[in-house]
């Protein structure tokens, strides 16, 4: 598997991540901290990178607190950090086509290399494989929290910003008008895919943000003709 060599210098101990074209220096930090250091270094994608992962993790924790849901904090954090890692250039992966499965494959190898507990690793992999909103599957709290948080990150001002950031970086988003159309489509679809009531309540607020923005944009561009 071809990949760009990346050096994540986070400590004195050297170990290579098997089969990923990645060389990592590991420290006495906890594995989850090492994983975050890695994602902070390689997760440079403007839409799916480190900042997105950190927002999703924080939002998932907020949802859990509001819903009083019990969950494993380490599993949720690692799943949030690695759920899109198969999209990053450092891994140069094109197969499998499903990015969730691709990310799960990369994550599994990383977790194995860092001796992550097998049972916890499986829970992380399951959450990653099932993270796209609308994909049916597990009732595990970590999976549901991650899935809802990812859906919410497509809504509101941040959701519109992410769609605009795709212009010119994604083949299917060639211009601003397409990005706006995609954002409007997600505004309509995502709320019905959310599981938790706290997620639905936040989605309603974020949808109002989007509707106000779209209305102002249409007024300023003759209904998007002048975009």
Predicted region positions:
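His-Asp-centered metal-binding catalytic motifs of divalent-metal-dependent phosphohydrolases/nucleases
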Residues: 73-92, 99, 103, 107, ...
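Active-site metal-coordination segments of metallo-dependent hydrolases
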Residues: 44-55, 89-102
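Divalent metal-dependent phosphate-bond-processing catalytic cores, especially two-metal-ion Mg2+/Mn2+ enzymes
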Residues: 42-70, 82, 133-227
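Low-complexity, intrinsically disordered Ser/Thr/Pro- and acidic-rich segments
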Residues: 9-10, 18-20
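An amphipathic alpha-helix signature
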Residues: 32-36, 57, 61, 100-108, ...
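Short, Lys/Arg-enriched N-terminal segments with co-localized hydrophobic residues
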Residues: 19-28
């Amino acid at each position: 598997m071809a990949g760009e060599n990346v050096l994540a210098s986070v400590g004195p101990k050297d170990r290579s991540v098997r089969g990923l074209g990645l060389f990592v220096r590991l420290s006495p930090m906890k594995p989850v901290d090492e994983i975050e250091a890695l994602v902070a270094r390689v997760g440079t994608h403007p839409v799916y990178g480190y900042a997105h992962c950190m927002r999703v993790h924080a939002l998932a924790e907020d949802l859990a607190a509001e819903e009083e849901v019990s969950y494993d904090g380490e599993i949720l954090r690692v799943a949030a950090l690695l759920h899109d890692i198969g999209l990053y250039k450092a891994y140069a992966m094109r197969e499998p086509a499903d990015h969730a499965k691709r990310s799960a494959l990369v994550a599994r190898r990383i977790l194995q290399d860092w001796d992550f507990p097998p049972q916890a690793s499986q829970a992380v992999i399951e959450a990653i494989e099932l993270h796209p909103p609308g994909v049916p599957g597990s009732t595990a709290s970590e999976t549901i929290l991650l899935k809802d948080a990812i859906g919410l990150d497509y809504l509101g001002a941040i959701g519109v910003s992410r769609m605009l950031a795709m212009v010119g970086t994604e083949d299917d988003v060639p211009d601003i008008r397409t990005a706006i159309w995609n954002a409007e489509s997600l505004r309509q679809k995502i709320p019905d895919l959310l599981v938790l009531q706290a997620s639905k309540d936040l989605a309603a607020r974020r949808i109002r943000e989007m509707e106000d923005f779209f209305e102002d944009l249409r007024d300023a561009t003759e209904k998007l003709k002048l975009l």
